[in-house]
């Protein structure tokens, strides 16, 4: 019975940590209080040893110094690290730990073997160092041994080089602030220079209040974002009202995080839950053990390593049985990429809710390397997850009613509104349901009012395709590959007060037949990003599925470099809505809770979405096909109303009518140069029609030896000028010009 209680006490990880720390502290005391005159294996004396641990400490210190020298301090250091790992329940094989420590002792003592010290019997590396050093001088390079020692020490301490760099950065910040505070005390009129936690150097005047540590957004409408270019390239870019200047919305419009953080389960409760989970798995004949536990804001992930020979499909198929046995709402089981474990996700007893403001204030959102930040939420470890729409480059979202899909889309839109002004990012919002996106109607970021008719949605997508082609021609003229390179060249030209010119063909020389070129000055304005948001894809596919599918495919394949991106959502992820063509062109997808495993496989390619908890619980698959579980933030309607009203007050929307209007003429972009047709070619076509009394497109095509599109444009121009009549029911045209 006594042995049972002793074993139970020693199995506690906290007790193990204290024992290791006490052993490490005792060894440090033994080594520090070492005296060469104390009794040892090599000397005998009648005096009482001066070692603080007594006779045992004297013999132990003599043994360690003789064999390992100064590297004996690695042993207590290892005890401290192991104790920390036991305290935080980071388990690793004992044999691996002992093996690593022995390697560190041998390699370190070898490096110090050539150093002689008076208070140590042998060298600084001990007897082991001398023996191994003699061997290494013959067979192993000393430089390689130094590298090996460094690697072993890093593995032993289980630290990361990033952690070391963070410590050095914080230390340098502290010393810098200390020195600057000293000079500021002596010279109070100097500017206050403070290094903030977001690794940016903010310089503020002495008479100004320092900025907040987290928020970098403007708090007043009078503050104007620094943007040297305020004009747009036609037809996308339009002038904004001069009496109202667009500004980023203040962070104060969002609700503050509530101090109602749910206290997570204790370590003992998690271990008890893990034991219950192992018992349930054993009941179903699945053997294995749990190697790690990750507690998140909504669910807790148990990393289960099955026994050899256990099929993954067998464990995944037990998700419903595990949920029933543990009285849980649902259980999701999936393979963790890069590990030989299965992640078993169980919901927490109490769910933690968080708002959008908490994530927008994080350094991850303020990272300027993320071009189009989308706030998705927190991962299983509670860390913010900010995705970059520019790298996706398009996003497909699916989820049933009440799963949090609309709130997630609102969070994405708001995260873009807090980053870019209307000069930098524009939206085309398509909402056939006339409910979700109507709140954003009237904001200056829109290219057109929120589109609610499916027929106009097709026209808007066609306009996006034309705008994409126009941008590609503009980028090709100045020799860049994407919108970032184009804007960079434009900014450089504006700073240098020069214009960018390009040659265009205006016709042919009637005598030589060679093309005639003229130099045209390009519009020196930046190209804004364009984000097309489709809230319900199913309604559009019912009305005009083929046209929508073709346009979406064209944009998804080519619009990335032009700065045009798509966020497409649907609450019915069936194969007739998310077709194979659409699915192949949207590598980045988000699945909220769905009704069946079939819908989950349709959107993600695997099951698991049907096991989600709803209310913002989602599965995110990036363009690397790695699926991660994310918990979305909450955005209420009051916050959206405040943001949209603020944007409407600071700037008036300037719409582009061509986005939703069917063009009267459909000239090919190849045949049109600055809105005109080759007059010489047009006169030849009119002369042929007058003389031959034939006005068919094919006849003009053969006579002038031109393409079909160019011939069709010439005939349509004749119809507009009154030379030929519109085609009748048989397609024939009447020639209105008299005969020569």
Curated annotation (Swiss-Prot):
Gene3D superfamilies cross-referenced by the UniProt entry: 3.30.980.40, P-loop containing nucleotide triphosphate hydrolases, Winged helix-like DNA-binding domain superfamily/Winged helix DNA-binding domain
Domain FtsK, first and last residues per copy: 382-601
Cellular component per GO, a single term: plasma membrane
Segments on the Cytoplasmic face: 188-740
SUPFAM superfamilies in alphabetical order: P-loop containing nucleoside triphosphate hydrolases (SSF52540), Winged helix' DNA-binding domain (SSF46785)
Membrane topology: Multi-pass membrane protein
GO biological process, one term: cell division
UniProt note: domains: Consists of an N-terminal domain, which is sufficient for the localization to the septal ring and is required for cell division, followed by a linker domain, and a C-terminal domain, which forms the translocation motor involved in chromosome segregation. The C-terminal domain can be further subdivided into alpha, beta and gamma subdomains. The alpha and beta subdomains multimerise to produce a hexameric ring, contain the nucleotide binding motif and form the DNA pump.
Name this protein carries in UniProt: DNA translocase FtsK
The species this protein was found in: Rickettsia typhi (strain ATCC VR-144 / Wilmington)
């Amino acid at each position: 019975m006594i042995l049972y209680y002793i074993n139970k006490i020693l199995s506690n990880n906290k007790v193990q940590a204290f024992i290791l720390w006490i052993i490490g502290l005792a060894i440090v005391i033994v080594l520090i209080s070492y005296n060469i005159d104390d009794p040892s294996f090599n000397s005998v004396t009648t005096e009482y040893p001066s070692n603080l641990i007594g006779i045992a400490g004297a013999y132990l210190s003599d043994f360690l110094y003789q064999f390992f020298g100064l590297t004996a301090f690695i042993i207590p250091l290892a005890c401290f690290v192991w104790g920390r790992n036991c305290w935080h329940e980071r388990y690793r094989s004992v044999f691996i730990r002992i093996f690593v420590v022995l390697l560190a002792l041998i390699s370190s003592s070898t490096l110090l073997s050539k150093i002689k010290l008076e208070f140590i019997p042998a060298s600084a590396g001990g007897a082991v160092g001398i023996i191994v050093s003699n061997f290494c001088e013959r067979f192993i390079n000393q430089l390689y041994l130094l590298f090996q020692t460094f690697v072993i020490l890093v593995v032993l301490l289980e630290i990361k080089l990033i952690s070391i760099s963070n410590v050095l950065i914080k230390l340098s910040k502290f010393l810098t602030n200390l020195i600057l505070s000293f000079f500021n005390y002596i010279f109070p009129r100097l500017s206050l220079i403070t290094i903030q936690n977001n690794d940016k150097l903010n310089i503020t005047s002495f008479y100004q209040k320092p900025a907040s540590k987290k928020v970098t957004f403007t708090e007043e409408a009078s503050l104007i974002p620094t943007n040297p270019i305020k004009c747009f390239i036609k037809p996308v870019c339009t002038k904004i009202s001069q009496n109202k200047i667009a500004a980023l919305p203040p962070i104060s419009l969002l609700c503050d995080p509530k101090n109602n953080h749910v206290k997570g389960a204790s370590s003992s409760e998690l271990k008890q839950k893990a034991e219950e989970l192992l018992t349930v798995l054993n009941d179903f004949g699945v053997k294995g053990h749990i190697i790690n536990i990750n507690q998140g804001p909504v669910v807790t992930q148990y990393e289960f390593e099955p026994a050899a020979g256990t099929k993954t499909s067998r464990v995944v198929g037990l998700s419903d049985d595990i949920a029933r046995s543990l009285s849980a709402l649902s259980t999701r089981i999936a393979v963790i990429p890069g590990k030989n474990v299965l992640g078993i996700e169980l919901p927490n007893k109490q769910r933690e809710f968080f708002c959008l403001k908490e994530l927008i204030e994080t350094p991850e959102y303020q990272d300027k390397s993320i071009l189009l930040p989308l706030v998705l939420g927190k991962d299983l470890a509670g860390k913010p997850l900010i995705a970059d729409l520019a790298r996706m480059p398009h996003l497909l979202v699916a989820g049933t009613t009440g799963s949090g899909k609309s709130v997630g889309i609102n969070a994405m839109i708001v995260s873009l509104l807090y980053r870019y002004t209307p000069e930098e990012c524009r939206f085309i919002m398509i909402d056939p349901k006339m409910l979700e996106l109507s709140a954003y109607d009237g904001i200056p970021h829109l290219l057109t009012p929120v589109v609610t008719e499916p027929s106009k949605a097709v026209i808007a997508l066609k306009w996006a395709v034309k705008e994409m082609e126009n941008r590609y021609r503009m980028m090709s003229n100045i020799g860049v590959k994407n919108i970032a390179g184009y804007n960079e060249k434009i900014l450089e030209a504006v700073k240098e007060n020069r214009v960018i010119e390009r040659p265009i063909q205006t016709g042919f020389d009637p005598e030589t037949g060679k093309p005639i070129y003229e130099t045209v000055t390009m519009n020196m304005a930046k190209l804004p990003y364009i984000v097309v948001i489709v809230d319900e894809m199913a309604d559009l596919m019912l009305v005009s599925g083929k046209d929508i599918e073709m346009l979406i495919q064209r944009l998804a394949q080519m619009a990335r470099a032009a700065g045009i991106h798509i966020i497409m959502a649907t609450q019915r992820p069936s194969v007739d809505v998310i077709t194979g063509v659409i699915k192949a062109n949207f590598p980045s997808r988000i699945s909220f809770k769905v009704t069946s495993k079939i819908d989950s496989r349709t959107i993600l390619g695997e099951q698991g979405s049907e096991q989600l908890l709803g209310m913002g619980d989602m599965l995110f698959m990036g363009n690397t096909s790695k699926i991660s579980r994310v918990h979305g933030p909450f955005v209420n309607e009051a916050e959206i109303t405040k943001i949209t009203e603020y944007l409407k007050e600071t700037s008036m929307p300037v719409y582009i009518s061509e986005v939703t209007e069917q063009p009267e003429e459909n000239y090919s972009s190849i045949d049109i140069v600055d809105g005109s047709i080759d007059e010489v070619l047009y006169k030849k076509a009119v002369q042929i029609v007058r003389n031959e009394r034939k006005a068919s497109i094919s006849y003009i095509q053969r006579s002038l030896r031109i393409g079909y599109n160019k011939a069709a444009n010439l005939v349509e121009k004749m119809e507009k000028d009154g030379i030929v009549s519109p085609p009748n029911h048989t397609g024939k045209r009447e020639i209105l010009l008299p005969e020569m």
